[in-house]
């Protein structure tokens, strides 16, 4: 993987080189000390991935991300103290087209963790679709809200799972779901603990007819609300005395992530049974494959994003190969498919 390092600190550029030195499959093709240099070298060096700081002179990282994604799109990983969990800069970078972020840290333990995260993300990045990232930025919010005709009896639930590339993909799906949706929507986006998921929920809420919020422990579940799992917790649903509530669980990661799609899927099955419509959008690994297979086997509907419109095809591919998916659709058709399948279930078809 041809990698370009962008950071205004010579020490940090050297530190990143050191982090990647033990990985022979990762080749450093150059470095830059500001965003302007990054834009120029992204054009001339044709890297497979760019590691980008945020706070730099001449041109900051966010401006550089926007410029690169408009001129010579390439997967970008933000790597900065300003992109710690929950940071507004991290969300803005992802909105502008960056594919993921990893936070710098000062402690030895966290430095080792950041090194592993960075190497893993670079190695998986080759399966991303940089032209799609540019396309998503150009097409955001242009699709109309999809309307349905509901005659519902019973409880229904919608599950959406995503990881790397998820924030931009979610912005293609959630804002196109109608405000009168007769089911709650549970979103599991892989993110570490912190305020990031809350910031993402607030942005989606601004863009959507539906109310979008970060889930709170023990809150009552209501149709027409999108619940985003907070980072660092598994999100489950439980029904007692005819009331469904969210239970946030602080336990061990599943598939090395928390929240995990599979955990939410299994808990939803106990509450909603076959009355589930579930969609997996993008991400590395295989989280969601097991839970979606269980949902499908129980009579629920499952949807995966197509490879040609998926940022990272790992999670959808794993679910497809596990026999867990009913239909594969382009990202821009997933809102219609969710509404169509929920409408069919509500109307007893």
Curated annotation (Swiss-Prot):
Its main location: cytoplasm. One of its GO terms (cellular component) is cytoplasm. It comes from the Archaea. The modification 4-aspartylphosphate is found at residue 53. The active site is at 163, 190, 287. GO terms for molecular function: phosphorelay response regulator activity; protein-glutamate methylesterase activity; protein-glutamine glutaminase activity. The keyword Mitochondrion does not apply. The keyword Phosphoprotein applies. Phosphorylated by CheA. Phosphorylation of the N-terminal regulatory domain activates the methylesterase activity. Disulfide bonds: none annotated. Contains a C-terminal catalytic domain, and an N-terminal region which modulates catalytic activity. Belongs to the CheB family. This is Protein-glutamate methylesterase/protein-glutamine glutaminase 1. It comes from Methanosarcina acetivorans (strain ATCC 35395 / DSM 2834 / JCM 12185 / C2A). The gene is cheB1.
């Amino acid at each position: 993987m041809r990698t370009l390092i962008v950071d205004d600190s010579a020490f940090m550029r050297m530190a990143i080189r050191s982090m990647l030195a033990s990985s022979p499959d990762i080749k450093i093709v150059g470095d830059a000390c500001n965003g302007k240099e990054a834009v120029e070298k992204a054009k001339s060096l044709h890297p497979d991935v760019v590691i980008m700081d945020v706070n730099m002179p001449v041109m900051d990282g966010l401006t550089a991300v926007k410029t690169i994604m408009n001129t010579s799109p390439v997967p970008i990983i933000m790597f900065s103290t300003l992109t710690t969990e929950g940071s507004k800069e991290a969300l803005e970078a992802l909105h502008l087209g960056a594919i993921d972020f990893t936070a710098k840290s000062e402690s030895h333990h966290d430095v080792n963790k950041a090194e592993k995260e960075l190497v893993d993300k670079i190695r998986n990045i080759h399966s991303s679709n940089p032209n799609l990232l540019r396309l998503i930025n150009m097409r955001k919010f242009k699709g109309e809200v999809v309307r349905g005709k509901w005659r519902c009896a019973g409880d229904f639930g919608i599950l959406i799972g995503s990881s790397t590339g998820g924030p931009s993909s979610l912005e293609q799906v959630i804002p196109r779901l109608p405000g009168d949706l007769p089911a709650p929507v549970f979103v599991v986006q892989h993110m570490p603990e912190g305020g990031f998921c809350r910031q993402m929920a607030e942005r989606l809420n601004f863009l959507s007819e539906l109310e979008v919020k970060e889930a709170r422990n023990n809150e009552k579940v209501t149709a027409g609300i999108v619940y985003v799992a907070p980072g660092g917790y598994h999100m489950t649903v439980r029904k007692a005395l005819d009331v469904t509530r969210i239970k946030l669980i602080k336990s061990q990661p599943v598939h090395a992530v928390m929240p995990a799609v599979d955990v939410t899927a299994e808990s939803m099955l106990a509450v909603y049974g076959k009355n589930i419509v579930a969609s997996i959008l993008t991400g590395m690994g295989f989280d969601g494959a097991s839970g979606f297979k269980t949902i499908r086997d129980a009579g629920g509907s499952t949807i995966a994003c197509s490879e040609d419109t998926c940022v990272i095809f790992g999670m959808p591919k794993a679910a497809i190969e596990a026999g867990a998916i009913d239909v594969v659709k382009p990202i821009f058709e997933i809102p219609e498919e969710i509404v169509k399948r929920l409408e069919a279930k509500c109307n007893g078809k």
